[in-house]
């Protein structure tokens, strides 16, 4: 005799985290597209690398509702730590040279402003998604046996 048990419903914070992670990916893809309009666009190799990274991220994000804790922690480490570092190293390095954000923005064109807005949205989405993945109901969901 076998017994079938229904999978518990995916908690709202986990569902919201999926949406917010996908928004982060969308912001990253949009930023890449905007970079194509700038004087030093990414080359074919960089575009392929980014496409593979984004495809892998989307696969992980879509696996999040499965409740496997390893998926949650993989997202937290790869995107929350490594991905965030990749987003902030360039601006921090630029600021460390004494550059002025006010002067930059005053002289920036539409594409440069779009990059700043998209990068900021990307970072904000990562932070929100991380918080959502570790809300109490999400923690309980990921602790259950799978």
Question: Which residues does each PLM region occupy?
Answer:
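Topology signature of small-to-medium multi-pass alpha-helical membrane proteins
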Residues: 1-146
